[in-house]
Structures are given as C-alpha cells and as structure tokens.
Curated annotation (Swiss-Prot):
Entry's Gene Ontology molecular function annotations: 4 iron, 4 sulfur cluster binding; 4-hydroxy-3-methylbut-2-en-1-yl diphosphate synthase activity (ferredoxin); 4-hydroxy-3-methylbut-2-enyl-diphosphate synthase activity (flavodoxin); iron ion binding
SUPFAM superfamilies: Nitrite and sulphite reductase 4Fe-4S domain-like
Species whose genome carries this gene: Bartonella tribocorum (strain CIP 105476 / IBS 506)
InterPro entries hit by this protein: Dihydropteroate_synth-like_sf (IPR011005), IspG_bac (IPR016425), IspG_bac-typ (IPR004588), NO2/SO3_Rdtase_4Fe4S_sf (IPR045854)
Enzyme class: oxidoreductase
Pfam families associated with the record: GcpE (PF04551)
Catalysed transformations (reactions): (2E)-4-hydroxy-3-methylbut-2-enyl diphosphate + oxidized [flavodoxin] + H2O + 2 H(+) = 2-C-methyl-D-erythritol 2,4-cyclic diphosphate + reduced [flavodoxin]
Any single GO BP term: terpenoid biosynthetic process
Record-given protein name: 4-hydroxy-3-methylbut-2-en-1-yl diphosphate synthase (flavodoxin)
Length: 413
C-alpha cells in the first residue's frame, strides 16, 4: 500500500500582502500573529497599562484598545509613553466606532501613538456622511503612515448595503437564502471599503480585513469567500464566541479549519471572561491553537496520559502539572538563555501501556509505575533509556534530570 495515502499536511499558505503594524509584520508569509484586546476603560491609564503589559507578557504581539471618547483618545499617548518606560514596545491598535474621524482629527497625539486603526464600515458613518467620514480616517492614516483594519461585524452590518443586496436578490429567478445574502453582505462590505481606501490613496500594504460573525459555519464560509476574492492580509476571529469551554471550542474549530486551509494572517480568540477572570487566557488559547496545529512554537509541550484504572495514584498528574507550571514560569528567562527551548517535548506517563513508548517519542520522558508494576520509573532521553528512578523522590529527581537536559541541549555556553 502506498504510504503517502496516509500523509496529511496543511494546504499551502494563502499569499497575502504584508502589513507592518509597528514592528510586527502581518501577512506576506510571516508567521501568524496572536493579538488580543483590553476590556479596561482606556481613559484609566493605570488599569489599561497594567492589562496591556499582562497581555504582552502572556505573548500577545498586538493589543487593541477602545477609543470611544475624548478622554480615551487623550489617554492613548500617555499609555504609549508609560508602556515604553516599562520596556514594553507592543504596538497598540485603536478600536474606533461612530466618531473615529472626529477623535483622530481632534487628537493628533493619539493618531500618532497608535500603530493601527480599526474601522467598522457598519458604523463609520451613515447616509451621506459615511464616505466623507471614512475618507477623513483614511487621510489621517495616510498622513501618519498607519495601517488600518477594516473590521466588518455581523452584529453591526452596513444596513444600506444589506438592503440593496436583499432587494437585488429578491429579483433573481433563484434567490439565495437570507443567510447567504448576509454572508455576501459581510464580504462585500469589507471589499468595497478596502477598494475605497485604495482609491483614497492608502496602499494595499496598509490594509488588513476582517469579517467576523458568531456562527462557526458562517465564519468559515465568509472567510473562504473573502480569501478567494482578494490578497489583503486577513485577521481571523469568531465574534461573541462565548464563555468557558464553549468559547474555546467554537473559536478553535472555526479558526483551525481556516488555518488548515492556509487562510489567516493574524488571530484573536474572543472569549468572555468570568467576572474578575484572567484576560490573558485568550492569548494562551491562541498560542495553543497555533502550536498544536504545528504553525508556531511558543512553549515546551508536556504530554501526559489522562489516567485510568491501571494508574496507582495521581503522582504522574501532579508531576506533569508541576513541570508544565515550571516551564511556563521560566519561559520569559529561558527564551533568551536557551534559544529553541520552546520546541521541547516532555512526556510524563502513568503506566507501562503507553508510558515507555510515549516517553521515547518525546525529547525527555518518564514512565511512572501503574497498578501491579514494579515500583520503578524509567527515564528516556531522545529515545534512549538513561536511568531508572526508585524510591520516594522520583518527581524531584526527574525535575533535576530535566533541568540538566535543558541546560546541556539549549545552553550556549
């Protein structure tokens, strides 16, 4: 049998125009960028700086902040200055709705401090004011050499365009469904706005598009269509994904399918946090998604079995949890000290069934004893058994072996 039948790999990455957002490149065959958004009142400089810093430290490469009124616009340059004093050079993206033209015009320091402007075609202006107010933002973006994201959202769709397409569809011999017309409206809203931005003098290398909806199948359909019709860089995100497990699963499925097709240049996982919850979770989920799909490496992987009736205790679970926590804690220092350590794979297994095999496939692994097994834990490094641990301090001994391995393999000294 031909072995190639079983091989699978992502489709070739869609070719898009690269866009510089500060010092971060989006599109143009660059690695997929993880970004996030604050939920603080931007006018509260202290709170916003604190959250941006936390998102940056978690791994967000771009952070979007709301700019919804004069006080928020006035705070942006202060936030930028404070972050730079703290040593954080993260590009800030301004999120504008309704009065973006006014805020950018009246607060030039804000326009200068931001690395990108997000514009929503559905509420940039209405009626005769729409094109004029859109043009004002494009003129400011051109003046300050800033890129824009034209961010269409299902929940704030351009009603004039939707009405037009609904009326045209009604005249067809075989009309599309309402859902299909809405999908087409989302796509056309993004593309028509991008075309207008180009007519107004903004280069293709200054335009990113997004077309967010809250249904997984709709999102896949919209982005697949958008990817076929243009070569602009694309920002992926499932809007209103929800809370907890549901939000993680919905976003991961939708974005994972698109990424597997080669579609997507930057992602944001939109999760509704619990009250007082950790805002950085959306960054971690985004990184995990890209890493498990093999597109990027952010952190070492710890493989651990789920446990079953063969496992005698929770020792292997506790060890796996502790090792993963230690790796996460040390990564800010290790990225500099041990280049390449993010590609490390560690296996912590609970019995003889899959333990030795999984440990051999990892860079370093341990197979703890299960029910009825000899109270010994073989350690494997790069496929070879190097030691067998016994006694009450197996966990501590393995941690020491792991630390030595990291130093020897990734240390530059």
């Amino acid at each position: 049998m031909n072995a190639t039948y079983y091989l699978s790999k992502p489709l070739e990455r869609r070719r898009s125009v690269g866009v510089a957002v500060g010092d971060v490149m989006v599109g143009g065959q660059n690695p997929v960028v993880v970004q996030s958004m604050t939920n603080t009142d931007t006018a509260d400089v202290d709170a916003t700086v604190s959250q941006v810093a936390a998102l940056w430290q978690a791994g967000s490469q771009l952070v979007r902040i709301t700019v919804d009124r004069d006080e928020a616009a006035a705070a942006v340059p202060k936030i930028r200055e404070r972050l730079e004093r703290l040593g954080f050079s993260i590009p800030l993206v301004g999120d504008f709705h309704y009065i973006g033209h006014k805020l950018l015009s009246e607060h030039p320091a804000c326009a200068e401090a931001l690395a990108k402007y997000r514009i929503n075609p559905g509420n940039v202006g209405f009626g005769a004011k729409k094109d004029r107010q859109f043009a004002e933002i494009i003129e400011i973006a051109s003046r300050y050499h800033k890129p824009i994201r034209i961010g269409v959202n299902w929940g704030s769709l351009d009603n004039a365009l939707l009405t037009q397409l609904m009326n045209e569809n009604a005249q067809q011999e075989n009309p599309l469904s309402v859902a299909e017309v809405m999908r087409e409206t989302v796509v056309q809203s993004a593309l028509l706005s991008a075309a207008l931005a180009e007519e107004l003098g903004l280069g293709r290398d200054k335009i990113i598009l997004s077309a967010k909806v809250s249904d997984v199948q709709d999102l896949i359909a919209v982005y697949t269509t958008l990817a076929e019709r243009c070569d602009y860089a694309l920002h992926l995100g499932l809007t209103e994904a929800g809370m907890g497990t549901k939000g993680v699963v919905a976003s991961s499925v939708a974005l994972g399918i698109l990424l597997q097709q080669g579609i997507g240049d930057t992602i944001r996982i939109s999760l509704t946090p619990e009250p007082g919850g950790d805002r950085t979770r959306e960054v971690k989920v985004g990184q995990e998604l890209l890493q498990v799909m093999g597109f990027r490496q952010f952190l070492p992987v710890v493989a651990a079995c789920p446990g079953c009736g063969r496992t005698t205790s929770t020792v292997f679970q506790q060890l796996a949890q502790k090792i993963e926590a230690d790796l996460h804690k040390n990564m800010p220092v290790w990225r500099e000290k041990y280049p390449g350590v993010e590609s490390l794979k560690v296996a912590v297994m609970g019995c003889i069934v899959n333990g030795p095999g999984e440990s051999k496939h990892a860079d370093i692994g341990i197979s703890l004893p299960g029910v009825g097994e000899s109270p010994a834990a073989p350690v494997f490094i790069e496929g070879q058994k190097v030691k067998t641990l016994r006694g009450d301090h197996i966990a501590e001994e393995f941690e020491g072996i792991l630390s030595d391995y990291i130093h020897k393999r990734f240390g530059q000294g």
